Design a protein with these regions (language model features):
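Extended alpha-helical targeting/anchoring segments
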Residues: 1-382, 493-497
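Helix-start/capping segments and mature chain N-termini
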Residues: 223-226, 256, 260, 326, ...
Length: 582
């Protein structure tokens, strides 16, 4: 979907608000926040529906801690649908084709040693008496493959969240938010917040683990600090004696994590505007620490990159009603690049190793792969699997990237045992499913001619698809392409991307001789790291040259090539002649 939309999704209760028919986007700098209510009144008078998107750094400018910061965003939609139960899943399913979607190579920007050094620095700041708790956060990056809406639907099932959101806007890319935390809820003159502080792993006897977390002195102390901060924030806009705390130290499960919350309530003074509420409370104290202002200064110095929407807020706003989440557990995906933030509250009692593990735990739900596996296909000669080391190395690397378990040495042992009696050439196929249990198939391999035909596939593939770098079980479309080519008398079909560059064959790597020099497409085009390709680059003499250049090659380059070679591990190096499309 490439039209702006917003789904505010209570996946636990099975209800959602779907905003569509985007009309316009208003933005407000922090210095202009008092104009918010006038903007709201104008949009509501037009019969439109308002949604808020507030980056964390807006709060820095609001507190005059930054000269410039990204603005508050107010999106206006003409249509609002209330969805319930299966209708939410049905709408999500309608937005994608069911192909696998996930993340590859999820990496944190801070290793354990660097993290420990920062925690030591935070402890020094706390000892100096200027802060009691600092919410220190890390960034993770990954390559995203498949439809982000399909990824959201899968993550939503893994970790149903009460304050989730899914959105797309050309200025933002895709936002996939699985937040368990409420920032602000307004109903008339009643306002409440549910700050989340206190974390434990959801394992073993869950009820016992919940009770243990609720009793834990360190987590209760963290929670109490933030509750006191938010009581102070809300007292700025509440009636005298109008702030109270209820449901203190409540523990709930969110996927693999247990989280502690306490509820802070406020009765608003007459005439309090939406702008005044945000000015008093934003950003949520649970993601800053205490005291808020100086701790935000420390955060700006300690963290290596902006948080952006992460730890900001997403939600809706109506004349007498407002719901804003704390935008944690939030993926932002732009052009296949995914960003994710995760952090924890650091106090004087915090242990760096424990806190780092907590960050890993909070991100664990991202590492669950979809229903996808890996394939390796290799040639067996005289009972010997050819280039087995290279295939196992690729299998292990791809498994790590996709988050699949893989015992490469166990696979090696099974492969060697299966091949021992294969005197004639055989085809060996290794399939590694999501659970990491390998499946080995061995079949006789018929000989083919060394001179073959190759055709061109007419449909362009996406420019960016990092899953193409891995030989996954999601390859029915590729099998269909080469099988169509075979039916037309060819060995394979050449694939091109939407920019017109040659990628590879549906089952082979491609090498072209142009003006006497040999070329092959670069891995940067998201092509398979072919075993035969790597061997030819290392041993170019195999095709009678001293060097092969990785180049972006167009259809015109293919047309003027004087020689074409196709290569894969099963068939080796083949000389090809180009024919028309099948």
């Amino acid at each position: 979907m490439t039209i702006p939309y917003l789904l505010l999704d209570d996946a636990r209760a099975g209800r959602a608000r779907l905003y569509r028919d985007h009309i316009r986007r208003d933005t407000l700098a922090a210095a202009d926040l008092d104009q918010l209510d006038a903007l709201l009144a104008r949009g509501w008078a037009e019969g439109l529906h308002a949604a808020l998107r507030i980056p964390y750094e807006f709060g820095l400018a609001l507190m005059e801690l930054a000269e410039s910061a990204p603005p508050l965003v107010l999106d206006w939609y003409a249509r609002l649908d209330q969805l319930h139960g299966d209708a939410i899943d049905a709408w999500l399913r309608d937005q994608h084709d069911g192909a696998p979607a996930g993340l590859l190579d999820l990496r944190f920007d801070t290793d354990r040693a660097a993290y420990a050094r920062t925690i030591a620095a935070i402890h020094e700041l706390i000892r100096a008496g200027n802060t009691y708790q600092i919410n220190y956060t890390l960034r993770a990056t990954a390559a995203s493959y498949g439809n982000p809406i399909a990824l959201y639907q899968r993550l939503r099932a893994l970790q149903p969240a009460p304050y989730a959101a899914l959105a797309w806007h050309p200025a933002d890319g895709h936002t996939l938010c699985l937040s368990p935390e409420l920032f602000l809820a307004r109903d008339g003159d009643h306002l409440h917040t549910l700050p989340m502080k206190g974390t434990a792993r959801a394992t073993g006897d869950i009820e016992a683990a919940k009770a243990a977390l609720a009793r834990d002195p360190k987590n209760r102390a963290e929670n109490t600090m933030i509750v006191d901060l938010l009581r102070n924030d809300l007292s700025k806009i509440a009636r005298p004696h109008g702030v109270s705390v209820s449901d203190a130290f409540h523990v709930a499960r969110h996927g693999e994590v247990l989280q502690m919350t306490s509820r802070v309530n406020a009765r608003l003074r007459p005439g309090i505007t939406h702008a005044a509420i945000l000015r008093a409370a934003y950003p949520c104290g649970s993601i800053t620490g205490a005291p808020k202002r100086i701790t935000m200064q420390y955060i700006a110095a300690l963290e290596g990159s902006p948080r952006d929407l992460y730890t900001g807020a997403l939600g809706y706003i109506e004349p007498e009603e407002m719901r804003l989440n704390v935008a944690i557990r939030t993926l932002q995906i732009t052009d296949g690049h995914a960003r994710f933030g995760v952090g924890s509250g650091i106090t004087i009692d915090s242990d760096a190793d424990d806190e780092y593990r907590e960050c890993q735990l909070k991100a664990a739900f991202l590492r669950h792969p979809p229903d996808i596996g890996l394939i390796e296909t290799l040639r067996v000669e005289n009972g010997e699997p050819q280039q087995l080391d290279a295939h196992l190395a690729r299998l292990a690397a791809s498994a790590a990237a996709l988050g699949l378990p893989c015992d490469a040495e166990a696979v090696r042992t099974e492969v060697i045992a299966r091949c021992a009696t294969a005197a004639q050439p055989h085809r060996l196929k290794i399939t590694l499913p999501r659970d990491g249990t390998p499946h080995i198939e061995l079949a006789p391999l018929d000989a083919i001619a060394r001179d073959v035909l190759v055709c061109e596939h007419g449909e362009a593939l996406p420019d960016r698809d990092p899953l193409r770098r891995h030989k996954s079980t999601h390859r029915t479309h590729l099998d269909r392409i080469w099988q169509t080519a075979v039916a037309a008398g060819a060995f394979d079909a050449l694939l091109y991307n939407q920019s017109g560059y040659l990628l590879e064959g549906a089952r082979s790597s491609v090498f072209l001789q142009i003006d006497g020099a040999w070329h092959t497409p670069p891995l940067a085009l998201d092509i398979l790291l072919g075993i035969a390709r790597a061997r030819l680059l290392a041993e170019p003499a195999l095709i009678g040259t001293t060097h092969i250049t990785e180049s972006r090659l167009s259809r015109a380059d293919v047309a003027r090539a004087t020689r074409i070679c196709l290569a894969n591990s099963l068939r080796g190096i083949l000389t090809a002649r180009r024919i028309a499309r099948p």
